[in-house]
From Swiss-Prot:
PANTHER family: LARGE-CONDUCTANCE MECHANOSENSITIVE CHANNEL, MECHANOSENSITIVE CHANNEL MSCL. GO terms for cellular component: plasma membrane. Pfam families: MscL. It is a multi-pass membrane protein. Channel that opens in response to stretch forces in the membrane lipid bilayer. May participate in the regulation of osmotic pressure changes within the cell. This is Large-conductance mechanosensitive channel. It comes from Bacillus cytotoxicus (strain DSM 22905 / CIP 110041 / 391-98 / NVH 391-98). Its main location: membrane. Homopentamer. GO terms for molecular function: mechanosensitive monoatomic ion channel activity. The chain crosses the membrane at residues 8-28, 30-50, 67-87.
Amino acid sequence: MWNEFKKFALKGNVMDLAVGVVIGGAFGKIVSSLVSDVIMPLVGLLLGGVNFTGLSFTFGKAVVKYGAFIQTVVDFLIIAFSIFLFIKLFNKLTFKKEEEKKEEVPEPTKEEVLLGEIRDLLKQQNASKDRA
């Protein structure tokens, strides 16, 4: 059971996923800081000095912090757009590699050409026997 688990855990896909999760978590923190510390203060400044973190209203005893929600939406949009660009770049690079592989088809060797001619002759002979 232990050996089977080691095989599973050390597969390339599992390790890639683990690295992706760790990097994704760190990237999320960077984007959150970018949104809350850089983008939203600038947007607030452009809108007349609005501080989005303090935007809220009280409904009875409940406090609805819609400013924090707006920051979270902007945070999500930036992360989603970044992932979109990354996947688009990845697909573009992968597609180029596939095109290069298709272009690198080697020409048939003399033996392969000769075997192809023999195959064609045998097909012709079998076709003429079937007609007769």
